[in-house]
Amino acid sequence: MNKPMRRVAVFCGLLILALLVRVNWVQFVQADELQTDANNRRVLIERYAHPRGDIIVEGNSITGSVETDDNDFAYKRTYTDGEMWAPVTGFASLFNTTLLEGIYDSILTGDDDRLFFNRTIDMLTGKDRTGGNVVTTLNEDAQRAAFEGLGDKKGAVAAIDPRTGEILALVSTPSYDPSTFTGNSSDDTEAWSALQKENNPDDPMLNRALRETYPPGSTFKVVTAAAALENGLIDGVDEKTAYPDPFPLPDTDGQEVGNLIDGYCPDASLRTALMWSCNTVFLGISDELGNETMMDTAATFGFNEEVFTPVRAEASQYPEDNRPQNAMAGIGQASNRATPLQMAMVAAAIANDGKLMQPYMVDQLVAPNLNVIEQTEPQEMSRPLSAENAQALQSAMESVVDEGTASNAKIDGVKVGGKTGTAQHGENNEAIPYAWFISYAMTDNGSPVAVAVVVENGSQDRNEVGGNALAAPIAKDVMEAVLAGQN
């Protein structure tokens, strides 16, 4: 072979080698990525070639699949009470899959490796392939109470069983009905477009219970109280403190912070300070403990890390900050921000004698033949405070409901502990405040429910905004719904 021919042969050989490398790269390295690419139309067509499995609440399906007359997509997803359940289910559509629909897509489509046996049997017997089911921990009555309680208000509710970490309710309003955009028509496209944030300032697709953080306001004072007890700064909830009213904010030019209610707060005990939401006491505690200790305590309750339920919840933030900002963070202001789920976790840890359980919303994954392929077991997440200190805080929080600022949460014959909050925000804190309430109900078998409620726009009159007026009645309804199911 002469020299020019050898060059051509070498060049052709290199081209063939490059082609083989590329083919193998696509086949073996990029295969999973291409198969799961949301823009891969073949994947979408296959996903909707069969009925999906269902998401289950208390034995009932809240999702379904119906046949279509579309040439490419044989089935589309349907939702029962779609707006109410959207913060739990998410959606499965040609646009995307989210939340439980997205996390467990392979189970619901039947493509999960653990369903190989079921797929094989279906193929051999000629049965249509079906997906597995996702069995949730949700309580339908509690979810409905939260959804109807919020009504047309913008806000969120999270409810947990403190003993196990099971999520009982997860509501975000305004919401959306996923059924309106699960098909392949122009109407579906219009419905999808109308829900996008750029076209809808209310952002109904934002999961406020998990993905929005708010200044927690005075509800955070129970964390500051826990920090005081756990670090030995105060010995018991009835020991008097020595913080002035008004409180001089440190390292400022004489700035002072006072209280909304006169007469109760000078030298108040933790019980009295929680009952009447004394800013001055908790400013003093946070300042005296310092930023590092306050950050550490907040972290034991779950702050500063994402929480997976398995749906991801945004990390709540107790910030590393200067002295005056740390003092303000101790009353739930400044850069302190929390999700409703996080504040439900705070109430749950106190109600469960200081033990915080990992929150979760999926109990089981079930194959089409009803075999359980995955079971969630309750797991301890942390111990933010001792049982003794937790029980002391329970006593104080129950005084808040019985004698203090949370009278609207009272339930006849039931011990209820709670804490109200009114969180300032906006430029110069001039926006309509957020109304907060966190609570738990106690029975002879421990606490079956802890709740956090936030209402963003409950009233346009600043003087009418308050956790007791706007948020506590919703929490009460949720707690009563759970308690009714215990009987």
Regions found by a protein language model. Name each.
Residues 157-161:
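Cytosolic beta-strand hydrophobic patch enriched in CBS
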